[in-house]
């Protein structure tokens, strides 16, 4: 859960998915 949220934030900020 926490890892998913962190990945989502990094994805939005870095725009690297």
Swiss-Prot record:
<feature type="disulfide bond">
    <location>
        <begin position="11"/>
        <end position="17"/>
    </location>
</feature>
<comment type="function">
    <text>Antimicrobial peptide.</text>
</comment>
<dbReference type="GO" id="GO:0042742">
    <property type="term" value="P:defense response to bacterium"/>
</dbReference>
<keyword id="KW-0878">Amphibian defense peptide</keyword>
<comment type="similarity">
    <text>Belongs to the frog skin active peptide (FSAP) family. Brevinin subfamily.</text>
</comment>
<keyword id="KW-0929">Antimicrobial</keyword>
<keyword id="KW-1015">Disulfide bond</keyword>
<keyword id="KW-0964">Secreted</keyword>
<keyword id="KW-0044">Antibiotic</keyword>
<protein>
    <recommendedName>
        <fullName>Brevinin-1DYd</fullName>
    </recommendedName>
</protein>
<dbReference type="GO" id="GO:0005576">
    <property type="term" value="C:extracellular region"/>
</dbReference>
